[in-house]
Amino acid sequence: MLPATFKLCAGISYRHLRNMTGLRRTAAVALTHELEKLALVGPGPGKWINQIRRKSILLSSRLEEKTLNDVEMSYIKQGEEALKKSLNILGDQDGWKTEIVMENGDKVLSKVLPDIGKVFKLEAVVEKPLDNVYGELVDNMEKMGEWNPNVKEVKILQKIGKDTVITHEKAAETPGNIVGARDFVSVRCSKRRGSTCILAGMSTRFGGMPEQKGFVRGENGPTCMVLRPLAEDISKTKLTWLLSIDLKGWLPKSIINQVLSQTQVDFAKHLRSRMTSSSNALSLC
């Protein structure tokens, strides 16, 4: 009975509803939820239900794609390209040179890549669970200016689908104004693969955000942050941040290298402070 019902919903009813976008999406999501409930009842045809669930999730994904226009789809592809390139860079363990090693174990490394230039990699441990760190960096990204003094503002310009956003970031000038204020327009995507979360991005063009007075428009990417539970203690999070950025302007490479590596070290410090203060605030509620 259930197989026939699924075929009816996904086949006959789909043809009938192909021009009713909201209902299609709602139906696909509802079907997924019902299948999840069935899987918990057991014992039963768990294997078959899992197969149908995967098909329904794929259907829901395809329906979402059909609601996006060509420009939005191009942004999604840019985000996925940034993710792929970033993971390829991080996957190559050869050629990394140490820039900074902190007493707490934080480490910044760098390497020079053809067609990209010098990239930096931060390796740090945050003593909070992955979901907490992910929530701060993704769900609360527009609040980053509250706790990271190197960032003036992060603003979401557009949300595309469930994993992709276009953002405008304003970076503060460095002490002594050695490097003036920069801003960036980026496409960002977030993915979760098992217990690993990946936040990737790269610069993009967005008609609604032309160059701003008082800021030099920089370019970044491919760049990403990889979050995973620390193997020795899953209540802590291992953070790996790949940074690839072009600050533009006439700046000596020595200054750029110093600024970018220090920016990563500072980020880890400020993130820890934010996570600690957030936990303390929750404990007082």
UniProtKB/Swiss-Prot annotation:
CDD domains: START_STARD1-like. GO terms for molecular function: cholesterol binding; cholesterol transfer activity. Disulfide bonds: none annotated. It comes from the Eukaryota. Transmembrane segments: none annotated. Residues 67-280 form the START domain. Its main location: mitochondrion. GO terms for cellular component: mitochondrion. Keywords: Lipid transport, Lipid-binding, Mitochondrion, Steroidogenesis, Transport. One of its GO terms (biological process) is steroid biosynthetic process. SUPFAM superfamilies: Bet v1-like. Pathway: Steroid metabolism; cholesterol metabolism. May interact with TSPO. This is Steroidogenic acute regulatory protein. It comes from Xenopus laevis. The lineage of its organism: Eukaryota, Metazoa, Chordata, Craniata, Vertebrata. The gene is star.
